[in-house]
């Protein structure tokens, strides 16, 4: 992969390190704010190619051949034909996932690799049986259940790489990465890595402030966003004995110990490492921060995405940042969420989602100066969860969730072109009065009553940022009814 800079051809790895050696200025709004490519630059109107309604839509992943998307759907999963991105078509809908004869609910994550699909849940404690189920999706229109594995912990997220499944395993006592072999007729645990075994001091902090939220894996390295503890790089070349490599963090254990209110620590910046992944080369890492204004000290704003040079994985260097869209009420309860959610780095492009702030494409070939190529949002109807590139490289899929507090949204899978452009007449995020159907009022600063976060009680004492009042929703029918009412929130 090469960059062409003023007539000089330079390998990306060399460029990333050279840019640091040249003495980059400290990160600031002026030095890292994305440059915008507009229609005036010769680009056209940007809009979705197509969409498909999916009740309970959450995480979406793309199949290896680019013709199928798989969508977690809270009470099950859906397979979608996206061979023609302009006409996404339902292939199969499975709403009867079971572990040990009991229904698996609050399914917010799926992962696919080749003909294997893994469904995991529940994303929170208090939703009944927990575990993973593997399917054969060699025929995506007819998924076949192969094996299941019951766990004694909820599963917020997972990722499948070949025959290995990497699972986030959080309890009050531990926040582990657990690795399974799913290649045979039975699923078997191989090994694990524990933050608290390495740094026991984090055990003094509220579990949610050190929560292992997600996992991505590339070239035998796992990238683990441990909320305020930071993002950890772990060598998983030996899945029976994972080993620490390094980590990056925006806050310290001492600073976290000084925060009196767990809500301020968990919902507000700094920290909030929510999702982390690297590009195709493994040289550029992005860390998304899911955060809201809490009424506390600065920074009182939604979370963005930070970009790190990891050409030397033992010595990460922060290079740039992509800031979130801003809105009139940036509190959790306000429902106008524009914080970073999931994303994909592919071929010097970052495909990102920002809930009601929409979807974006950035050119990150120079990570110190991300260049925005496209942005589309419809906050009256959508809240985007993730973006995943199809194998053709000509389109990407993005799932939209209905489960944002105090809203009336619809779950769906959207398809978008991979091209630069500007949306025609987008709705204003800063002035939502004309389109906002929420019943709550707003305020200019995001401070005050609307910044009150969820009550921390779910029977187990183990609640996750973004989930509120849902512990009793164990059955599929009740969970779907809850989603339709949008009285609570499902947040990944």
What are these regions, as identified by a protein language model?
Residues 1-492:
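Hydrophobic alpha-helical segments
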